[in-house]
A protein has these predicted regions:
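Boundary/entry segment of secreted carbohydrate-active catalytic domains
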Residues: 1-46
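Histidine-acidic metal/acid-base catalytic patches
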Residues: 1-12, 32, 60, 81-97, ...
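Active-site beta-loop-alpha junctions enriched in small/polar residues
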Residues: 14-23, 45-49, 69-75, 104-106, ...
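Short, surface-exposed basic-aromatic patches at helix termini and helix-loop junctions that form
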Residues: 36, 57-64, 123-127, 149-159
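Structural motif corresponding to the early beta-alpha repeats
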Residues: 36-113
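Residue-level marker for buried hydrophobic side chains located in beta-strands
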Residues: 66, 134, 162-165
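Catalytic cores of phosphodiester-bond-cleaving enzymes
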Residues: 110-139
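Basic- and aromatic-lined ligand-binding clefts that recognize polyanionic substrates
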Residues: 131-155
Length: 348
């Protein structure tokens, strides 16, 4: 369960806990070792209760229970999917802190139905006191005002709250800001090597800088409701081909020319933006609390296994283990950045 005593830290940092590459259970044992070393909570992906049961075996103990990100196809507009959420909540009561589900484009035109369904789900969740929260994540690119409005209508649903995905909110605002200046030109059509980029880069970076204020505004709006708010933290840039977010906060985007003295562009947030998001969340959610998950997917590299080599003594080729180890090291770096952005508790 979420909520904290006065002596507890004001925000919990989680990171993705999953098997990112092909291999056996040694990869999950590696994740368990690294999570225990960095002291981060876990957020795991699970499509079925049995799948979650399996992964939880490898998650090390932590003061904050794991958060579970359900399949992105789950649509809480539908009774059968709310029943699935309830099944997870019942089976893992007392073992997980929260369940994350995505919003959907169609919800924008069915707000009343969504709110009614979430009130119904909340009533069922409240029947089991040790059960998890359910967080509706901003993911479909709907107007942020709609998202806040839904949250306000569910203010009294004590077991239902919201997840702010800073990448999704930021990219929507970046695209809108750029479109205002360049109607008819879609940012998705551009890339780092586009010949038009030198003439457009200043406006693109101006739009990129507009992401942070909007994330902070949504954070303050939800914080005023007095509920626990969960955050998915990752960086991104509209010029990245394919998936434009889910990068770490120390990443820059390489370009083939110099802009402001560098042959790379700053992403939407960077370490400074991350610090602003975290500190604003802590300030905005004093009563309900806030939690954070480092949701970084896009990592390429290998790192020697070092102290974890014994886990893979039965492997002939440890390339995938080293890839997993490198990804975990990036999660660790970003988890430390996030934890260092949380203001210390005042001395008493």
């Amino acid at each position: 369960m979420y909520g904290r005593d006065a002596d507890e830290a004001p925000g919990c940092v989680h990171a993705l806990f999953q098997q990112r590459v092909d291999g056996d259970e040694a990869l999950l044992r590696l994740a368990g070792l690294r999570f225990a070393q960095i002291g981060a909570g876990a957020e795991v992906y699970a499509d079925t209760p049995d799948q979650l049961e399996h992964v939880l075996r490898f998650v090390p103990s932590h003061p904050s229970l794991p958060v579970v990100h359900l399949n992105r196809g789950v649509n809480v507009l539908h009774g059968r999917d709310r029943a699935l959420v309830q099944e997870f909540a019942d089976r893992f009561a007392g073992r997980i802190a929260g369940l994350v589900v995505h919003d959907k484009r169609e919800m924008g035109a069915q707000t009343d139905r969504l709110v009614a369904g979430m009130h119904e789900l909340n009533a069922r969740l409240c029947q089991r006191p040790a059960g998890p929260m359910v967080f509706l994540e901003y993911a479909a690119g709907l107007d942020r005002g709609w998202f806040v409005e839904v949250a306000e209508q569910l203010r009294d649903a004590e077991r239902v709250s919201f997840c702010i995905d800073v990448g999704h909110i930021g990219l929507r605002q970046v695209s809108a800001r750029f479109a205002d200046r360049h109607p008819g030109l879609d940012l998705k059509e551009l890339g780092p090597a586009d010949h038009r980029l030198p003439d457009l880069v200043a406006d693109i970076q101006d739009a990129v800088a507009a992401a942070l204020p909007h994330v902070l505004d949504v954070t303050r709006s939800l914080g005023r409701l007095g509920k626990h708010v969960h955050f998915h933290l990752h960086d991104g840039h509209p010029l990245v081909p394919g998936l434009r977010d889910h990068f770490g906060f120390l990443t820059r985007l390489p370009i083939p020319f110099s802009y402001q003295g560098r042959r790379s562009l700053s992403m939407m947030y960077g370490p400074g933006g991350l610090a602003s998001i975290v500190s604003t969340a802590i300030d905005a959610c004093p009563s309900g609390g806030a939690s954070f998950t480092i949701e970084v997917h896009q990592v390429e590299g290998r790192l020697p296994l070092s102290d974890a080599a014994w886990l893979f003594a039965h492997w002939q080729d440890t390339a995938n283990a080293e890839r997993m180890n490198y990804w975990l090291s990036v999660l660790s770096e970003n988890a430390m950045l996030t934890a260092n952005s949380i203001p210390p508790m005042p001395l008493r």
